[in-house]
Amino acid sequence: MALGKNKRISKGGKRGKRGKAQETMARKEWYDVVAPANFEKRQFAKTICNKTQGTRIAADVLRGRVFEANLADLNQSAGEEEAYRKVRFTVQEVQGRNLLTQFHSMEVTTDKMASLLRKWCTTMETTVEVKTADGYTMRLFVVAFTKPQANQQSRNCYAKQRLVKWLRMRITKMIKRRLSKVQIKEAVSLLTRNVLSDALVRRCNPILPLRELRIRKVRVVRTPKFDAQALLSAHGTIPASVEADQREVEEAVEAAPAAEKAAE
């Protein structure tokens, strides 16, 4: 009977030749996420990434990451009144241990939208797509709710269809006129500080009395070619991270004993 190799039996290897297990966190670095200059709190988050090793560059891995923050945390002077809005940023450039971000989207929380719904009124929604002066295409979702007129006897406050169409047309024209003349930095300030929504309420109230008008969602659907100078001008002076300096000192102190042992 011929004997052959039995594939079911694993070949025994040399024992004791396993490499020393390296700690996972030793291969990683911490980075600070920096918001543009039109927000009060600049460094609002931290993230972790593997160190540059061979052809795998850390900066390439970090670009494109999206981070979410609460608007009340970014603009602390506004207080808890702005806690119902979430702002997202996308990383565009890596500068040392700082990640320079740009506006990605903004959205109203689900519980806030649920609290605005009422019976006996008309809910109007419209979508507006506008291109800023520096080439960013933004899509805005606006929602409005009617309210009873003064001295009204009827229980409901439903709006006629022709007035709803007129309201949508005015909202669309005003948003395009205001945002098409400014850059992305000024457009974000108009949206986050309620300047645009307040102007829409003043212009739409003569047509229909509105109980609420909210820009419930904003998305950047198309971006221009990356411009490093424009990104740096949007960020202005980038605050230094004291913790990052401490981390570099700790890494240098840990590397010194290892170098002394190698010399011996």
From Swiss-Prot:
The protein, known as: Small ribosomal subunit protein eS1
The subcellular location is: Cytoplasm; Nucleus
For this protein, the record's Pfam families field holds:
Ribosomal_S3Ae (PF01015)
Annotated region described as Disordered, given as residue ranges? 1-23
By sequence similarity, the record places it as follows: Belongs to the eukaryotic ribosomal protein eS1 family.
Which Gene Ontology cellular-component terms appear in the entry? cytosol; cytosolic small ribosomal subunit; nucleoplasm
**Record carries keyword Cytoplasm:** yes
In the record, what lineage is assigned to the organism producing the protein? Eukaryota, Discoba, Euglenozoa, Kinetoplastea, Metakinetoplastina
Query: Which terms under GO biological process does the entry name?
Result: translation
